[in-house]
Amino acid sequence: MVSVNLSSLPIVLDMINRNDDLNIQVIKLENGATVLDCGVNVTGSFEAGKLFTKICLGGLAHVGISISGTLDNKMVLPCVKVKTSHPAVATLGAQKAGWSVSVGKYFAMGSGPARALAMMPKVTYEEIEYRDDADVAILCLEASKLPDEKVADYVAQKCGVDVSKVYLLVAPTASIVGAVQISGRVVENGTYKMLEALHFDVRKVKLAAGIAPIAPIIGDDLKMMGATNDMVLYGGRTFYYIKSDEGDDIEALCKSLPSCSAQTYGKPFLEVFKEANYDFYKIDKGMFAPAVVTINDLRTGKLVTHGNTNIDVLKKSLKYTEI
């Protein structure tokens, strides 16, 4: 079975070799672990965001950035495009932010290949029937501070690898790399909802593609958390190739998947978050989904779509001003 860590390693090494070109910084910790600062003390870049996103996806996806194919001529934003032939493993086995890394006073949301070594969370890997056994651990951290040796030791211990084989990539939400990688979760938002909310077997998803606008840097991490989520919820478009079984209701699945099925639809994410007293667990799971879902049923040949992009909410979220 393909290894998400070994598939990502060449991309990590490429980033290290091109760190000046990518506007990132490489830091070697005293215990031998390697930290790639992609936005804490550096600017980062679109290219770094693209590679960071590809690593989050376990190296099992094509990631591109374009100014074309956006929403309409009235609102032009750069977009991130994702295509994968391994949807379940790439999105849920790697990209899903399923590891809350907490060591002392350090906290970060962890995603990427190392999760498949630490089995974080175990239930996800049981459901997609996947586990990695590589001797290298690559973890992507969404945080505004860089990790230290204690964090690297913790990751090494959880993943069962030598700490010298640990690579930690860090990008704050309020950074270009952070904005790119969150919009790059457009396909994962759909597979996550399929599995977590709709209890659909995501192993039936054979191919997937998606595109979402990239949030401009409009403020601190909290404001950017709202804006980056809105890019997918109100601007993300996805396409899933599913090989259904006879008992599967693909039309019902398609109708339930987009963010418009959530009770909180129509409000910028930050408003919803505030109403939930800043508690993610109080937010309707159905909201975490792309705006538009199209499904091609490979068994029946049917093609169904549901949802719409919502430019009005995007403009409100970004405080978009036409002058």
UniProtKB/Swiss-Prot annotation:
Catalysed reactions listed for this entry: 5,10-methenyl-5,6,7,8-tetrahydromethanopterin + H2O = N(5)-formyl-5,6,7,8-tetrahydromethanopterin + H(+)
- Could you list this entry's UniProt keywords, alphabetically sorted: Cytoplasm, Hydrolase, Methanogenesis, One-carbon metabolism
Q: Which InterPro entries match?
A: METHMP_CycHdrlase
Give the record's pathway.
Answer: One-carbon metabolism; methanogenesis from CO(2); 5,10-methenyl-5,6,7,8-tetrahydromethanopterin from CO(2): step 3/3
Which Cys pairs are S-S linked?
A: none
Per the UniProt entry, the Enzyme Commission number(s) are 3.5.4.27
Task: Quote the cellular component terms of the Gene Ontology held in the record.
Answer: cytoplasm
- Cross-referenced SUPFAM superfamilies: Methenyltetrahydromethanopterin cyclohydrolase
GO biological process per UniProt: methanogenesis, from carbon dioxide; one-carbon metabolic process
Q: What is its main location?
A: cytoplasm
Q: Where, per UniProt, does this protein localize? A: Cytoplasm
Record's superkingdom? Archaea
Q: Which GO molecular function terms does the record list?
A: methenyltetrahydromethanopterin cyclohydrolase activity
**One Pfam family name from the record?**
MCH
Instruction: Name the enzyme's class.
Output: hydrolase
Summarizing the function annotation, the protein's role is: Catalyzes the reversible interconversion of 5-formyl-H(4)MPT to methenyl-H(4)MPT(+).
Task: Please give the NCBIfam families that the UniProt record associates with this protein.
Answer: one_C_mch
Provide the family line.
Belongs to the MCH family.
This chain belongs to which protein, by name? Methenyltetrahydromethanopterin cyclohydrolase
Originating gene = mch
